[in-house]
Amino acid sequence: MSDNEQEESSQVVLKEDKTFVTFFQSLVSSNEDTDTIRLFDRKGYYSIHGEDAVFVAMMHFKSKKSLKYWSISDPNPKKKIKIDNDGSLTTTASSSQQQQQELGLAVLTIRQGYEFENIVKELLDEKKKIEIWSMKPNSKQQWELIKKGSPGNTQMFEDVLLNGNCEGSVMMALKVTREKGSIVFGISFGDATFKTIGVSQFMDNDNLSNLSSFIMQMSVKECLLCCDQKNYDYQKVKEKLSDAGIPFTELPKSDFSSKNAEQDLTRLLGSVKNNLPDIEQEHAIQSASCLIKHLDLLSNPNYFGKFKLEKYDLDRYMKLDSSSFKGLHIIDLKDSSVSAAAGGGGAGGASSSSNKDQSLYNLLNQCNTPMGSRLLLQWVKQPLLNAEEIEARLNFVEAFYNDLELRQSLRSNDLKKIGDLDRLSKKLHGQKATLEDCVNLYGIVTRLPVVLQSLNNHSSIHQELIKVNFIESLESIISDFAKFCAMVEKTIDLDLANDKHEYVIRSSFDETLRGIQLKKDQISNKIERFRVDIADDLNLDEAKVKLHYSEKDMFLLRISRKDEVAIRDKKKYIVHATAKDGVRFATREIDTLNEAYKKWSAEYLDKQDGLAKRTLQIAASFVPLIEDLSSLIATLDVFVTLSHVSSIAPIPFIRPEIIPLGSDENGAGTVIIGGRHPCVEIQDNVNFIANDIDLTRGQSQFQIITGPNMGGKSTFIRQVGLIVLMAQIGCFVPAQKATIAVVDCILSRVGAGDSQLRGVSTFMAEMLETSYILKVATKNSLIIIDELGRGTSTYDGFGLAWGIAEYICNQIGGFCLFATHFHELTILSDLLPMVKNLHVSASTQNNTFTLLYKVEQGPCDQSFGIHVAILANFPSQVIENAKQKAKELESFESNTLKQNHNKFLEEFKEINFNSNDVEKSLSLVNSLLNKYSIDIN
């Protein structure tokens, strides 16, 4: 803590609460789980204490100034809570010197509502567990736990999390075993917020690539792990979860019992036996049993028959690991070590990290509805492998792309007015809905005919497709909602809801309510007469004195700020507020009438309680229909959005031609004409240079890209990866023409950076990621490698780059883009027929250096390092010294060093590199270096 912060904080010392302090310290000492943050409900606000308070203050407020301290008499003098110099709280032995540093027990208070909701969301994002404690009824000193949650179990915080655009909280139960020498994962995954549960059982390789892809694509937030300390694979799973930042809990094997799993699943799914997972997925069924138990799903009867079964088919989606998500900037991840902008290059350098369109998802997500945004995120994380499914999506996008009038109608009017149906259904299902929610749902349903009319007006070659998938479904849903609409119109006062935002049962529905409403009407009529009289008293036109109603203040009069002079210095007029829309005021008589109106309103709510509950119960029976509508609207929204984004790009996107997975053996492949990086081209002051790529099987499937730094190599290889991914999502792509061969995974090794928190150097990080690629990639994969070998000596780096490139060509046979600063690698094209060279061009005419960002055929014929240094405004003396030293080295190389270098390369080509044994490969290279006395230092 800084001196200023400590001085400010130490001035705020609260009265000691010995009983609570004793309870809190015993609570902390009895639980060693440092990932749990405890909040105490103080009836109006929440308090957080100790190290929890410091953590939340820094997380949310980015400062410790909001902390206060209890000056405490510690009941345990052997332990004291003190503030360290860095502001953290620690427990230490007592001493007079330490006591002088003590401020006491840190206390942080947070308001209910928006502030509390944001902090809960932030804590869950930080992978923290949360506990809410409250005072026991009729007690002033005893506390009880009333709510708890974790990143993967947010059932008790549904109302908080659904008050925004969340993607759900997926908990995963996992069991790992070996069968016939292969790793087998039995997984069950569930999201209690969105009432989904699923199972998946699959084999994996030693690098756990399938598990990595599953974790990323299913947005797993937390894991329940079947403990098996003797299993070597189990230790690797723990490391994989830790690397992915997934908190996990180790549980005994007894928790993974399939004894009652089938029965439990049937109760949750409400389905017959035939719809349950295959019995062959025994390990997945066992994991499902664990998941159901630890989410305590069977304790809530409201869950019975309400869950939906999800299936994760490993063969349906493209594999994407965290490196690809980060390297290609597909979505925004919390890992800030990776630049959020597309790398330097094609548009004249790296983009600003503050650009809101820095990720592909941010670029595409112009959805009108929260449901659409959630579905789009799922699609971006799970690109398809089946060409027919991809073509089906492209047909929908094309239909809306070619119909501007329909697209604008849906985006500007129809979809924009549809609220969060997921949130509405969860509130109704969880019995937390209000009459206002019923009115909101009614408003959405009554707008559906407008959406239907817009769709009916569409005419194109895809007209039948729109009819079968949207029009007919929407007609059925509208028909099924007819009874709901009739109930709302009969029971809820819609006029009052629209005029005054009061959501009550119609007074005509009950004699008592009719009498109370009469009293309220009499009061409002009196206030209206006051309004007319006051306008006359103020010498203002009657239309200028308006009646303003709010649930908080009831009735107030409002005049413009310009007319405020009319009530100035007149004591009988009481100003309540001044806002942009004018000055709100009243008289004592109006204030008295407001108190009476508030009293009758409260009595009305009390008398209607039973009728309101019955209305909400009936509304809850429509939850399955709401979920169907939500799914339909989300899908429609995504297709309309993808067509919209494709049409408004600086140069409109085009529909790609799709080649099915594995059908490019006859020489076909991915060919992109005039390709562009979708996230870079939209940036301000960017004139993007489009480039071509031809990845043809057996002819040009391995492309080596050389050229100057900042010339566009990184942007070029990333844009190819993004275009392929966009096509497999079912989106149009930024190009003049594109033929995309479906790939089973995109594997990337881009950027050079240390992983200091893991104790991993730049070079080791490169080797680990590259080793993973070599073991996971197949002939149908797209591999993207950017500047491999920068983290070690020149010869080691070059040797490994050569060996890795050769292995990819000869052993894997996949598509690869290999950007490198090792120009010597370009001779691979003379040795291997599938290798082709590309380079990013630059001009050095008239002693000037200009980056052209154009990708051209052939290798780069010179180095531009000094030219780039000039662009970076290096001092002229440094530039001149560099030029002189470069000439000396070139002259030196023309003699013995150059001869040795050439001999080294000749023998180096003959080495058969083993990707599984990096040390052996390095040993072979070092022996050659020693043989020819080549110094790498």
Swiss-Prot record:
GO terms for biological process: DNA repair; mismatch repair; mitotic recombination; postreplication repair. SUPFAM superfamilies: DNA repair protein MutS, domain II, DNA repair protein MutS, domain III, P-loop containing nucleoside triphosphate hydrolases. Keywords: ATP-binding, Cell cycle, DNA damage, DNA repair, DNA-binding, Nucleotide-binding, Nucleus. ATP binds at residues 707-714. Residues 635-709 are annotated as: Interaction with exo1. Heterodimer consisting of msh2-msh6 (MutS alpha) or msh2-msh3 (MutS beta). Both heterodimers form a ternary complex with MutL alpha (mlh1-pms1). Interacts with exo1. This is DNA mismatch repair protein Msh2. The lineage of its organism: Eukaryota, Amoebozoa, Evosea, Eumycetozoa, Dictyostelia.
